[in-house]
Amino acid sequence: MADVTAKMVKELRDMTGVGMMDAKKALVKVEGDMEKAVDFLRENGMAKAAKKNDRIAAEGLANVATVGNVAAIVEVNSETDFVSKNEMFQDLVKDIATKVAENKPATMEEAMAIKTEKGTIESDLIEATTVIGEKISFRRFEVVEKADNAAFGAYLHMGGRIAVLTVIDGTTDEEVAKDVAMHIAAINPRYVNESQIPQEELEHEKAVLTEQALNEGKPANIVEKMVVGRLQKFKAEIALVDQPFVKDPDMTVEKFVASKGGEVKSFVRFEVGEGIEKREDNFADEVMSQMKN
């Protein structure tokens, strides 16, 4: 049996990011062969990762990457917010965004199969799950393309807690597009303009507003006028271009972009963990532990 030295253990740890005992066990198992030790850890990592699939990954980071006229926005989840500060995790999220922009996959299955330096996006996620010790999952992505006379705007809030990707037609000024992306991160509009709002959503809101006005005891002829005004306000609140621009509330987003020769074409906003139901027992345990202190 080959001697396993502290130097060998350190080298393997540097290569893989695993703990000291795991590195030593791997080297002993393969009799000091460094390449086989790496393979052993990755193989065992895949087995460990598979056992973590029942965990809920509701934290993490979102990111945006642009490659020429193609951009990608991605969300990669972890189990705890602490991992979002991990350099390996941050690099993984950036790499995934870049690879998705370069390859333009149409489905998550295609995205997972994209080749990377170490293997595929899927195998990189499994390796990260093993090394970091938390379930790491690639939740979603969107690929967006633009014309030559358009600009991408990318903005990350809180280091990637919120990511926004915008497309502004008619100008190549990326600062304008970024300003709009910043506005979207802060205000969270749901549509670019009124025409995108589904009719059933408007009908539902109209019914609610009508009931509100009637409950206020207003006469029928006044109710109709009130509902028209309130419905218009509702549409402006959820449609991006009609909102007061955060950096200059005296003008709307539409007027700001138009003053730069552009027009908002589209946007995508990812907020990490939105729509994922977190386990309540984690929060309860946290509260109980604080009460004991």
Swiss-Prot record:
Q: What is its main location?
A: cytoplasm
- Presence of keyword Protein biosynthesis: yes
Phosphoprotein among the record's keywords?
Answer: no
Location of this chain's protein in the cell: Cytoplasm
Ranges for region Involved in Mg(2+) ion dislocation from EF-Tu: 80-83
Which Gene Ontology cellular component annotation is one that this UniProt entry carries? Answer: cytoplasm
Q: What is the role of the protein in this entry?
A: Associates with the EF-Tu.GDP complex and induces the exchange of GDP to GTP. It remains bound to the aminoacyl-tRNA.EF-Tu.GTP complex up to the GTP hydrolysis stage on the ribosome.
Q: Which SUPFAM superfamilies does this UniProt record tie to the protein?
A: Elongation factor Ts (EF-Ts), dimerisation domain, UBA-like
Protein family (similarity comment): Belongs to the EF-Ts family.
Annotated GO MF terms: translation elongation factor activity
Q: Which UniProt keywords apply?
A: Cytoplasm, Elongation factor, Protein biosynthesis
Matching entries from Gene3D superfamilies are given as: 1.10.286.20, DNA helicase RuvA subunit, C-terminal domain (1.10.8.10), Elongation factor Ts, dimerisation domain (3.30.479.20)
UniProt name for this protein: Elongation factor Ts
Q: Which residues cross the membrane?
A: none
